Amino acid sequence: MTNNELVYPTDPLKIALIGTGGRARGQYCPIFKFLQAWVEVVAVCDPVRKNCDQAAEMLNVTAYYDIHQLVKDKPMEAALVVTPVPSHHSISVYLSSHGIHNMCETTWCNTLGQARQMIETAKDNKVIVRVAENFFRFSIDRFAQILRDSDYLGSIQRIFSYNDHTGYHNNSRWIAFAQSHPLWVQSIEHSMPTISFYSSPQRFHRNENFRARYFGFNQNLLVVDSASNIKGFLGRQSRPGHTEWQGESGTLLYRPETAELRYCSENNQQSQYDLPGKGGGRADRVYPVVKEIGEDGQWLRTYCQTDDTLIEYLNPYRLDGYREKSIGYSCAIADHISDFCLSVRGLRQSEFDEQDALMSLMMEIGAQESALNQGERIQLPVVGETEAEAKTYQALKQQYCVDPMDIEAMLDISYPKP
């Protein structure tokens, strides 16, 4: 079984980094030097001058403190937007309207109306818009995708995930695994009081919310996605929680301390015509799923050697010499940046395009709508007005005192975090 080989453009895509907060400087800036075949960073932009100057110094590029001036000078072909979610829509539409390709961090935007305008504006101006989604590019998901294609477990028709990451990220994971969009969602939510505490300077807690989402896909695939406290406060199970990909003849299991492939061999498979007896249906072959790390701390591959076959995903993005804190995370970022570049250059169809980005948001809005209506099944894609989206729109309007669809008004807002 082979993985896709790397594809290189004739010339790198000139990009501007918009947003130079902790994530941009901590996760993106250090890896750009490994991506010079795909992208050339030519400018950074942020109204917070201290952050912007630091990023500009790290990358040895020009610092801009005003997006209007950046777009006027236009040293770039495309932009990578690493700013708070409420700013994504206005920045994306503004860039697209000036012929600049753009990729925004997750979550892509807040409302379906915003997402649709981002897509329409890009189409009208013949530019590419993408979301910088990396969760389905992580080690275990890449292995699960290879396992799916191998048919080793037969058809995988159920995924159970507890306390990993409900919401936009996980929605995208399920789309990528299913290679299609879901048909419906049902959701329930539950809240309970807890002791009060700060989990970060901007996050104060006095209760805990639990969400359980059920997504139905084609080919009888059901995803059960639930979580309440993914950071592990109050002694709860923390991320990555417990996830199972359940197939006809076994299970791929993933949790913090282990990943393994559990297989029910032919010895434990029986037909109704066999003599009845005990012991059938048990997974009698259990194989470790190994994440192999190089001497420099780089993720090399994820594989499982069974009795009769090797199932493996080879990581093509070797950031040689860069010892990252979260092993494999930077490789996933490199993956979506190169995917964006190749899409702009017309060299590859994106693995996760703008319609997928829209559906991930629809899954979230649909889940919220279902929970508001006592678990009613919501058909996807979402059409028409929803109470959930109206609540989101009003909350944004109240928070920023402007219409969230007003591009210039939203561009004028600064979103620094403590």
Protein language model features and the residues they cover:
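C-terminal glycine/acidic-rich active-site capping loop/insertion
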Residues: 12, 216, 243-244, 249-351, ...
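Beta-loop-alpha module in the N-terminal Rossmann-like domain of NAD(P)-dependent dehydrogenases
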Residues: 61-122
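Rossmann-like dinucleotide-binding domain that binds NAD(P)(H)
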Residues: 155-249, 253-262, 269-271, 355
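Short active-site oxyanion
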Residues: 39-43, 77-79, 157-158
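Hydrophobic residues in well-ordered beta-strands that form the structural core
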Residues: 65, 104, 129-131, 254
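Glycine-centered short loops/turns at secondary-structure junctions
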Residues: 99, 126, 347, 374-375
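A contiguous active-site-proximal alpha/beta segment in oxidoreductase catalytic domains
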Residues: 86, 109-172
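N-terminal Rossmann-like dinucleotide-binding module
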Residues: 1-59
